[in-house]
């Protein structure tokens, strides 16, 4: 995997977590060599190992192990714990958090993965969501865009050149998915209920979620990825301050 502009980083256990308003975004490869994969597998909990074993495709299984292992490394370093000792819990819709309530109150995180690239965002003072997607061709993308976008968003989408529409579709997707993760609602509300404004532009943007069940606002920014062909976004339930993006190396020296 060709990485542009981010040096490999591995912090030591107990390194300071993000300060108020600050977010750390760690980017890593999900395609790792067998020795690294074995080391990451050793960090997983029994339920994570069970989830991995239920995946029939060998590459999908290996990427799951690589993603969960490196997530544990990132969170363990923030907490000053061994990666294998980190305990997670999940909301009914699958949003992960730390099992210990005191730890969960001071450290929020959000993982994402697409194809060969994984991302973990960490923040201390607000709920967050991150999403990364590989830009690729989708059959009948026009119909999917009509279902996903609001009226004003679709007008903007329809005006851009056809050669740019796949990229713009995924730019919309990651912003809405990251916002849904920050709110903990997943896809339940429907992406057409998430209104991005102002858009397009440099951001940060606000994303309003209005439905019978939810009225909420998140803030969202694009996160440049160091690997060509991917797009990503970060969302939070409070305004977004400084964002530090770094490449995570699971075997770099502490």
Where are each of the predicted segments found?
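Core catalytic alpha/beta fold that binds nucleotide/phospho-ligands
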Residues: 1-254
């Amino acid at each position: 995997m060709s990485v542009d502009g981010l040096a490999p980083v591995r912090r030591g256990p107990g390194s300071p977590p993000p300060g108020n308003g600050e977010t750390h975004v760690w980017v890593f490869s999900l395609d790792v060599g067998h020795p690294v994969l074995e080391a990451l597998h050793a960090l997983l909990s029994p339920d994570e190992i069970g989830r991995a074993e239920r995946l029939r495709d060998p590459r999908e299984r290996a990427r799951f192990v690589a993603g969960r292992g490196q997530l544990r490394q990132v969170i363990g370093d923030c907490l000053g714990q061994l990666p294998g000792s980190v305990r997670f819990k999940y909301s009914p819709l699958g949003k992960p958090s730390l099992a210990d309530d005191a730890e969960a109150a001071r450290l929020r995180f959000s993982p994402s993965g697409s194809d060969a690239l994984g991302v973990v965002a960490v923040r201390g003072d607000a709920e967050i969501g991150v999403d990364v997607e590989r830009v690729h061709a989708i059959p009948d993308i026009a119909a999917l865009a009509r279902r996903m976008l609001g009226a004003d968003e679709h007008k903007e989408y329809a005006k851009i050149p056809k050669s740019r529409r796949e990229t713009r579709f995924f730019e919309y997707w990651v912003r809405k998915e990251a916002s849904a993760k920050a709110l903990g609602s997943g896809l339940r509300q429907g992406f057409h209920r998430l209104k991005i404004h102002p858009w397009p532009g440099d951001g940060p943007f606000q994303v309003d979620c209005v439905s019978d069940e939810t009225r909420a606002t998140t803030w969202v920014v694009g996160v440049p990825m160091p690997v060509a062909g991917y797009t990503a976004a970060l969302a939070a339930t409070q305004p977004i301050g400084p964002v530090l993006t770094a490449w995570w190396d699971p075997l770099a020296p502490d």
